[in-house]
């Protein structure tokens, strides 16, 4: 079917890199082609004894920035992982035919009987999978030579190797969320010894949004730098919405399965059952969901202290399970059946994101008995999941004052055995409505510096409504800044070089290079053009400073002073 902007199921998908080109780096262990974008610079810049006429950047946009790839959003993007042959060799068919409602004819896969299929399983056996080599190449950004020679600002000036990736996964300090039924995925890694990652939340609700809008938002989030996307749909057509998102997503997709389970019982939390939830897990596993948020750590003993809070339980999944426990007078069935949950996860290599059902919803509730009590249970569940070779990350707060953030990271490392931490912010104040994306990025920078592996974005609509396309862009870019700032502080050579090239371009008045090296080139270019017009300047003089005018530019005068004797 031809693409049509009039067709509500065909949102505009094609995205191109801004003044950059798509490049691919070949694997040496596996037949991989790892996509990156390369920015062409207007002049050579020197750093660490090397000359740079271009700069390769980490690219989360998949085929959407590759003009050589053609695709139909109703059929999905190319299944790149199928070409590596590893999954087909190591797994069996999970069904005779494609599931009902599938957009493709691909038969879902599962682990072979009595054998493992997870990245942790292979890592413990000493096997480097295609996904491990892929993420090592991505993390290096084709800057291995410069990394080895780099000293200033870098703490760990050593290129990432596939073996290092394998060892981190084997130890549980990093995960590659990559369901064997998501062949469109371009693998990425989440761990504190790697680039800090960003997650974007999307999803319809009973109040608004269509399938097409959510697919477009997921692609849009990838365009601006989201490393993973969570589909938090709670409205109609949850299964179909998820299928469209998965088949068109080059990044890992996460879900909160309890949302769909709740929809199946008409929104009545106390009517939920383990059997219904189990079937929902399997349904989503066969579709290809890469990680599940599961609120298995909230127990009945945590409810009394939670009820004393200023803002109670603010996690949707947490409030659902709290109501179920109280209404039925029983322990959380997600906790009671966690071993069975892990058996499902290990069958398809789905990572578990252990949900923080008791995250604080206000700074008054931060670091309280309920929050840290649940965190200890999440540590117990982590070791249980590792017994099944299931990859684990831990979800964290939430609303936490700036001076109390480091304690969260320290306790998470202690209680949860160094499993990756994934936080919503933290938001450092409660009064930033309309600007909570900035609020979140402040706390996010600090906790990422202390070791948090992935930041969940917050948009300007946080606490106010569902984000639209512009909100998604704003939220992703602001949190990309936070993650990048933490990467610099942690000693990332690639992050340091990116900033150094920008500073050289700024000093040289190389405006196009400044735009292209920024995280939002379109906005930077637009604001500069508006400033030129406001100053009545044509732009013919490249040294004209739109900040200071012709007579007060410090960089211009600094360069002039250099010529004086």
Curated annotation (Swiss-Prot):
Known role: Catalyzes the synthesis of the hydroxymethylpyrimidine phosphate (HMP-P) moiety of thiamine from aminoimidazole ribotide (AIR) in a radical S-adenosyl-L-methionine (SAM)-dependent reaction.
Binding-site residues, substrate: 201, 230, 259, 295, 315-317, 356-359, 395, 422
Residues the entry annotates as binding [4Fe-4S] cluster: 545, 548, 553
Cofactor(s) listed in the protein's UniProt record: [4Fe-4S] cluster
GO cellular component terms, semicolon-separated: cytosol
The protein's name: Phosphomethylpyrimidine synthase
Pathway membership: Cofactor biosynthesis; thiamine diphosphate biosynthesis
Similarity annotation: Belongs to the ThiC family.
Gene3D superfamilies from the UniProt entry: 6.10.250.620, Radical SAM ThiC family, central domain (3.20.20.540)
Catalysis performed (reactions): 5-amino-1-(5-phospho-beta-D-ribosyl)imidazole + S-adenosyl-L-methionine = 4-amino-2-methyl-5-(phosphooxymethyl)pyrimidine + CO + 5'-deoxyadenosine + formate + L-methionine + 3 H(+)
GO molecular function, one term: zinc ion binding
Classification via InterPro entries: ThiC (IPR037509), ThiC-associated_dom (IPR025747), ThiC/Bza_core_dom (IPR038521), ThiC/BzaA/B (IPR002817)
Gene it is expressed from: thiC
Binding site for Zn(2+): 399, 463
Entry EC no(s): 4.1.99.17
Record keywords: 4Fe-4S, Iron, Iron-sulfur, Lyase, Metal-binding, S-adenosyl-L-methionine, Thiamine biosynthesis, Zinc
NCBIfam families per the UniProt record, alphabetical: PRK09284.1, PRK13352.1, thiC
């Amino acid at each position: 079917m031809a693409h049509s902007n009039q067709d509500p199921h065909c949102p505009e998908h094609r995205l191109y890199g801004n003044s950059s080109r798509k490049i691919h780096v070949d694997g040496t262990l596996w037949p991989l082609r790892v996509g990156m974008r390369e920015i062409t610079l207007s002049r050579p810049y020197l750093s660490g004894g090397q000359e740079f006429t271009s700069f390769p950047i980490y690219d989360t946009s998949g085929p959407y920035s590759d003009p050589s790839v053609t695709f139909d959003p109703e059929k999905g993007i190319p299944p790149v992982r199928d070409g590596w042959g590893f999954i087909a060799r190591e797994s069996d068919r999970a069904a005779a035919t494609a599931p009902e409602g599938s957009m493709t004819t691909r038969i879902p896969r599962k682990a072979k009987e009595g054998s493992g299929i997870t990245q942790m399983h292979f890592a413990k056996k000493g096997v480097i999978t295609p996904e491990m080599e892929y993420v090592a190449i991505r993390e290096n950004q084709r800057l291995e030579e410069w990394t080895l020679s780099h000293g200033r600002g870098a703490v760990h000036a050593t290129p990432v190797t596939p073996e290092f990736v394998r060892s981190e996964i084997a130890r549980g300090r990093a995960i590659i969320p990559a369901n064997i039924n998501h062949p469109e995925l371009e693998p990425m890694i989440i761990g504190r010894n790697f680039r800090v990652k960003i997650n974007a939340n999307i999803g319809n609700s009973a109040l608004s949004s269509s399938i097409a809008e959510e697919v477009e938002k997921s692609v849009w989030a990838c365009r601006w730098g989201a490393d993973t996307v969570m589909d938090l749909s709670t409205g109609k057509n949850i299964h179909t919405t998820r299928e469209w998102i998965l088949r068109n997503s080059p990044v890992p997709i996460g879900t909160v399965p309890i949302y769909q389970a709740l929809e199946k019982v008409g929104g009545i939390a106390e009517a939920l059952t383990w059997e219904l939830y189990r079937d929902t897990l399997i349904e989503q596993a066969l579709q290809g969901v890469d990680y599940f948020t599961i609120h298995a750590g909230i127990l009945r003993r945590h409810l009394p202290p939670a009820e004393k809070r200023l803002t109670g339980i603010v996690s949707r999944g947490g409030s659902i399970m709290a109501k179920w426990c109280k209404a039925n007078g029983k322990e959380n069935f997600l906790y009671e059946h966690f071993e069975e949950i892990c058996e499902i996860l290990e069958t398809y290599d789905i990572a578990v994101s252990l949900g923080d059902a008791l995250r604080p919803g206000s700074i008054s509730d931060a670091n309280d008995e309920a929050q840290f009590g649940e965190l200890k249970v999440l540590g117990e569940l982590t070791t249980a999941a590792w017994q099944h070779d299931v990859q684990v990350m831990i979800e964290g707060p939430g609303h936490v004052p700036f001076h109390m953030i480091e304690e969260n990271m320290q306790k998470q490392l202690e209680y949860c055995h160094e499993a990756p931490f994934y936080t919503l912010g933290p938001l450092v104040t409660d009064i930033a409505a309309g600007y909570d994306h900035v609020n979140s990025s402040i706390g996010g920078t600090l906790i990422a510096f202390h070791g948090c592996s992935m930041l969940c974005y917050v948009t300007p609509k946080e606490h106010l409504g569902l984000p639209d396309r512009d909100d998604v862009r704003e939220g992703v870019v602001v949190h990309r800044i936070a993650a990048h700032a933490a990467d610099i502080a942690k000693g990332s050579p690639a992050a340091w070089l990116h900033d150094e090239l920008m500073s050289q371009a700024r000093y040289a008045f190389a405006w196009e290079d400044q735009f292209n090296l920024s995280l939002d080139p379109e906005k930077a270019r637009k604001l500069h053009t508006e400033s030129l017009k406001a100053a009545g300047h044509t732009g013919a003089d490249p040294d004209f400073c739109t900040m200071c005018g012709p007579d007060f530019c410090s960089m211009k005068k600094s360069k002039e002073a250099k010529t004086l004797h």
